[in-house]
UniProtKB/Swiss-Prot annotation:
<feature type="region of interest" description="GTP cyclohydrolase II">
    <location>
        <begin position="205"/>
        <end position="425"/>
    </location>
</feature>
<feature type="binding site">
    <location>
        <begin position="28"/>
        <end position="29"/>
    </location>
    <ligand>
        <name>D-ribulose 5-phosphate</name>
    </ligand>
</feature>
<keyword id="KW-0342">GTP-binding</keyword>
<dbReference type="Pfam" id="PF00925">
    <property type="entry name" value="GTP_cyclohydro2"/>
</dbReference>
<feature type="binding site">
    <location>
        <position position="144"/>
    </location>
    <ligand>
        <name>Mg(2+) 2</name>
    </ligand>
</feature>
<feature type="binding site">
    <location>
        <position position="264"/>
    </location>
    <ligand>
        <name>Zn(2+)</name>
    </ligand>
</feature>
<comment type="similarity">
    <text>In the N-terminal section; belongs to the DHBP synthase family.</text>
</comment>
<dbReference type="GO" id="GO:0003935">
    <property type="term" value="F:GTP cyclohydrolase II activity"/>
</dbReference>
<comment type="function">
    <text>Catalyzes the conversion of GTP to 2,5-diamino-6-ribosylamino-4(3H)-pyrimidinone 5'-phosphate (DARP), formate and pyrophosphate.</text>
</comment>
<comment type="function">
    <text>Catalyzes the conversion of D-ribulose 5-phosphate to formate and 3,4-dihydroxy-2-butanone 4-phosphate.</text>
</comment>
<feature type="binding site">
    <location>
        <position position="360"/>
    </location>
    <ligand>
        <name>GTP</name>
    </ligand>
</feature>
<dbReference type="InterPro" id="IPR036144">
    <property type="entry name" value="RibA-like_sf"/>
</dbReference>
<dbReference type="GO" id="GO:0005829">
    <property type="term" value="C:cytosol"/>
</dbReference>
<feature type="binding site">
    <location>
        <position position="29"/>
    </location>
    <ligand>
        <name>Mg(2+) 2</name>
    </ligand>
</feature>
<keyword id="KW-0862">Zinc</keyword>
<feature type="binding site">
    <location>
        <position position="29"/>
    </location>
    <ligand>
        <name>Mg(2+) 1</name>
    </ligand>
</feature>
<dbReference type="InterPro" id="IPR032677">
    <property type="entry name" value="GTP_cyclohydro_II"/>
</dbReference>
């Protein structure tokens, strides 16, 4: 496994005017970009970038800068397969020659990052390619564009970077990949990080939720407090059903019974027997009610293990044709499980939870909640009922996704509801 450096080192290097290398996901470009802060651009840095990269130098900017400078899309309908938001190319209007030299491009980069610059300070077209980053950075789009802007902002600089893809020194005509990038980083004293690490760092160190409303909700299991949250960057709403006092004068936030439940319209609302989600939700509410203290956190945006409702219905079509729940996702070009629990962890922290007994049979959920200042002291099995419609689904979760589901092999379709088995979507 390739050795990586810390995000903290990368941020410090960016602040100091050094370049870093950022690798994206293997399922995306699987390439490493040389990145530095645009306001720190020098002729030497640009020359180094040109020497070891493709030479197609881009300057990622946040949306506010693009709007201020009148940087319009390069083409009305973006057809780039990764959605990179190219704008019209530019040169600095004054202080440069032809615009192509390292010195000229460094001047243009610094001007793009200058908060006092205006649209008329640039000529169009030019030799530098500004890119528009998504609001929310890598949390919205895991690309090098957003990584550059995030790193600059985290370093206390203007949200403007300079990026270009590093080319292979071993395989002429190809881009450099992970192992070669590590060697290159060591040779030149550069930090090497991944976009995944940057996403994880931001999720752990920044708050991305807002508590919006709280209301009393009487249910057949008793009364809960429904506390509504919005996710700042994802335009998704979540709700926590809270019973009893979690933290406060008479509670310390420890030993809280918690269920983090993934949204499932078909199971939770329509009572679909293809999954075990509805019975799990009902059982979790009942168990928290009996406990007298706990949280059932209902996570929106997790439909179909994160692939969305329409894709889930398409996956059902494939399952009806013989695929299992995992293979169906993969046949659609989607991950077997695309859920992220970072927002859920932040909500639990906001509610005052410090340590919990987690209601789940999915070990991955436990891993997904670790590392956010939360301590999971126990995994509590959540019983549900298997039936003829969901038994194959449950077995696939057990066999391919590692869910802890005991007793499924004893199921017989001739028996209507054979007993209770744990399952966690």
């Amino acid at each position: 496994m390739t050795r990586l450096d810390s995000v903290e080192r990368a941020v410090a290097d960016i602040a100091a005017g050094k370049a870093v290398i950022v690798i994206d996901d293997e399922d995306r470009e699987n390439e490493g970009d040389l990145i530095f802060a645009a306001e720190k651009a020098t002729p030497e840095m640009v020359a180094f970038m040109v020497r070891y990269t493709s030479g197609y130098l881009c300057v990622p900017l946040d949306g506010a800068i693009c709007d201020r400078l009148g940087l319009l899309p390069m083409y009305a309908v973006n057809q780039d397969k990764h959605g990179t938001a190219y704008t019209v190319t530019v040169d600095a209007r004054n202080g440069i020659g032809t615009g192509i030299s390292a010195s000229d491009r460094a001047t243009t980069m610094r001007l793009l990052a200058d908060p006092t610059s205006v649209a008329d300070d640039f000529t169009r077209p030019g030799h530098v390619v500004p890119l528009r980053a998504k609001d929310g950075g890598v949390l919205r789009r895991p690309g090098h564009t957003e990584a550059a802007v995030d790193l600059a902002r985290m370093a206390g600089l203007q949200p403007a970077g300079a990026i270009c893809e590093i080319v292979s020194q071993k395989d002429e005509g190809s881009m450099a990949h992970t192992d070669e990038l590590r060697v290159f980083a060591d040779e030149h004293g550069l930090a090497l990080i991944t976009i995944a690490d940057l996403i994880e760092w931001r999720r752990k160190h920044e708050k991305h939720i807002e508590r919006v409303a709280e209301a009393r909700i009487p249910t057949r299991h008793g009364e809960f407090r429904a506390i509504g949250y919005t996710s700042i960057y994802e335009d998704v709403e979540h709700v926590a059903l809270v019973r009893g006092e979690i933290a406060g004068p008479n509670a310390d936030g420890d030993d809280v019974l918690v269920r983090v439940h993934s949204e499932c319209l078909t199971g939770d609302v329509f009572g679909s027997r293809r999954c075990d989600c509805g019975p799990q939700l009902d059982a979790a509410l009942a168990m928290v009610a009996r406990e007298g203290r706990g949280v059932v956190l209902y996570m929106r945006g997790h439909e179909g293990r994160g692939i969305g409702l329409m894709h889930k219905l398409q996956a059902y079509q494939l399952q009806d044709a013989g695929a299992d729940t995992v293979d169906a996702n993969l046949k659609l070009g989607l991950p077997a499980d695309a859920r992220d629990y970072g927002i859920g962890a932040q909500i639990l922290v906001d509610l005052g939870v410090r340590s919990m007994r987690l209601l789940t049979n999915n070990p991955a959920k436990r891993v997904g909640l670790d590392g956010y200042g939360l301590h999971i002291i126990e995994r509590v099995p959540l019983p549900v009922r298997a039936n003829a419609e969901n038994i194959r689904y449950l077995m696939t979760k057990r066999d391919k996704l590692g869910h802890d589901l005991a007793g499924l092999d004893d199921f017989h379709e001739s028996v209507h509801l054979p007993g209770e088995f744990g399952g966690a979507l």
